[in-house]
């Protein structure tokens, strides 16, 4: 065994019928961790149900159904390998909560794969004003997914089949759109594929011999390697807190930045509670250190379960510890609000693992969301499609950071009426020091 392959996360985006499931299913089927026996079972069921289109979407449908029924599917099923990377597919969208997941998402995508329906009418529907293609691309960019691969899918169903003219037309239109969003189209491979027939997915297709660029698999291998933020100070948002007999209090969460190790003195914001980490575990094995991306449980001394909650953030007490946000300024894009938003609006913010009502205290400016130029000072309101800078005040103690320093703690979804009405990235935070914070004996000894 040589060096372990690098892990990357990809998010597959695009309009509802663009063929995301088929394409993703195909990759997982050909390159992935799905057990041959499982595939055979699916194939047999598909045949019994006369699903000729079993092909690959069926694999994904089965996985989703099993996941939704609460059958824990081995997460390996959402993984596949390229020559260079282990790829994990982040929750395939089309899902109501996709936007929320993408933001508070358990993981930030390293690359977006945009699937485009190249058929007549299909492409136009996806890219139209209210098509999801635009929204997904805008979200990916706003949320810091800087690399993108575009797949012109369903090339087997263009008129004529495998039409170069149609491909050229789509590349031109999508490039101009992606450029407006903020991407550099010259750096984006546009791969003509058929997720259904398999053209250019893994091997080069003779049906598309006019195309000289990479296959989808090649394009995934050409993603530039992500830098993991282990050299930043520790930030670990808590997902849950358990009391484990014989061990004590065990907070659980994902290391977003920095490193967590036994013996470290950590501070939990917003309360400022400070204590020593006794041990760190992942998948029931103890670790000498946990890095960004690791989902860990760690045991802390002299702390009651009731003193810690989901949404609290653990940090190193000696290295830029996290603190409560008194208020913060964010760039917000309204994507799905039926009316208009003015000062005093108080929706719920989902940021990392916290879920807290926040007041839009002051709409500071309205900006052009593409260029960032100011359009209006102190606008009366913001409506769908608008972007602006807003000063926000949490209604309860909350921990957030600027997007530039700690990206996973600096992006959020604004939820109202059971849907995501806006997304935002935090530009600056005014912090406040905790008062009367408890420092445990274990932590005092380490001082």
From Swiss-Prot:
It is found in: Cytoplasm. Keywords: Cytoplasm, Elongation factor, GTP-binding, Methylation, Nucleotide-binding, Phosphoprotein, Protein biosynthesis. The gene is TEFS1. Residues 70-74 are annotated as: G2. GO terms for biological process: translation; translational elongation. One of its GO terms (molecular function) is translation elongation factor activity. This is Elongation factor 1-alpha. Residues 5-230 form the tr-type G domain. GTP binds at residues 14-21, 91-95, 153-156. HAMAP family: EF_Tu_A. Residues 14-21 are annotated as: G1. It holds the Pfam family GTP_EFTU_D2. The keyword Nucleotide-binding applies. The modification N6-methyllysine is found at residue 261. Residues 194-196 are annotated as: G5. The modification 5-glutamyl glycerylphosphorylethanolamine is found at residues 289, 362. InterPro entries: EFTu-like_2, G_TR_CS, GTP-eEF1A_C, P-loop_NTPase, T_Tr_GTP-bd_dom, TRAFAC_GTPase_members, Transl_B-barrel_sf, Transl_elong_EF1A/Init_IF2_C. Residues 91-94 are annotated as: G3. The modification N6,N6,N6-trimethyllysine is found at residues 79, 187, 306, 396. The modification N6,N6-dimethyllysine is found at residue 55. CDD domains: EF1_alpha (cd01883), EF1_alpha_II (cd03693), EF1_alpha_III (cd03705). This protein promotes the GTP-dependent binding of aminoacyl-tRNA to the A-site of ribosomes during protein biosynthesis. GO terms for cellular component: cytoplasm. Belongs to the TRAFAC class translation factor GTPase superfamily. Classic translation factor GTPase family. EF-Tu/EF-1A subfamily.
């Amino acid at each position: 065994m040589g060096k372990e392959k690098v892990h990357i996360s990809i998010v597959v985006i695009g309009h509802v019928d663009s063929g995301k499931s088929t394409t993703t299913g195909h990759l997982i089927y050909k390159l992935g961790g799905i057990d041959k026996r499982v595939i055979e079972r699916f194939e047999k069921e598909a045949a019994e149900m006369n699903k000729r289109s079993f092909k690959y979407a069926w694999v994904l449908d089965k996985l989703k159904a099993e996941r939704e029924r609460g059958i824990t599917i081995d997460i390996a099923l959402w993984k596949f390998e390229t020559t260079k990377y282990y790829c994990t597919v982040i929750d395939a969208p089309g899902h109501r909560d996709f936007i929320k997941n993408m933001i508070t998402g358990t993981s930030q995508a390293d690359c977006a794969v945009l699937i485009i329906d190249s058929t007549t009418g299909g492409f136009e529907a996806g890219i139209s004003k209210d098509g999801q293609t635009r929204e997904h691309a805008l979200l990916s960019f706003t949320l810091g997914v800087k690399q993108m691969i575009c797949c012109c899918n369903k090339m087997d169903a263009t008129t004529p089949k495998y039409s170069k003219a149609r491909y050229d037309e789509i590349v031109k239109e999508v490039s101009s759109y992606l450029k407006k969003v903020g991407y550099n189209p010259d750096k984006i491979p546009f791969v003509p594929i058929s997720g259904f027939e398999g053209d250019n997915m893994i091997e080069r297709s003779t049906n598309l011999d006019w195309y000289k660029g990479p296959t989808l698999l090649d394009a995934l291998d050409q993603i530039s390697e992500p830098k993991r933020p282990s050299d930043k100070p520790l930030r670990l948002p808590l997902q849950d807190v358990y009391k484990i007999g014989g061990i004590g209090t065990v907070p659980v969460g994902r290391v977003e930045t920095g490193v967590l190790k036994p013996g470290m003195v950590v501070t939990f914001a917003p309360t400022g509670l400070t204590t020593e980490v006794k041990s760190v575990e992942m998948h029931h094995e103890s670790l000498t250190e946990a890095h960004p991306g690791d989902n860990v449980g760690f045991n802390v001394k002299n702390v009651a379960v009731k003193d810690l909650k989901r949404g609290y953030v653990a940090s190193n007490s000696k290295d830029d510890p996290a603190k409560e946000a008194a208020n913060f300024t964010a760039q917000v894009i309204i994507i799905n609000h039926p009316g208009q938003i003015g000062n005093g609006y108080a929706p719920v913010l989902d940021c990392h693992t916290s879920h807290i009502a926040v007041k839009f205290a002051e709409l500071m400016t309205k900006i052009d969301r593409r260029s960032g130029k100011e359009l209006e000072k102190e606008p009366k309101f913001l409506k769908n499609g608008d972007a602006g800078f807003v000063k926000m005040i949490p209604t309860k103690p909350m921990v957030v950071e600027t997007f530039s320093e700690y990206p996973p703690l600096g992006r959020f979804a604004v939820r109202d009426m059971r849907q995501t009405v806006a997304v935002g990235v935090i530009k600056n935070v005014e912090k406040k020091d905790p008062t009367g914070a408890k420092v445990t004996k274990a932590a005092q000894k380490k001082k």
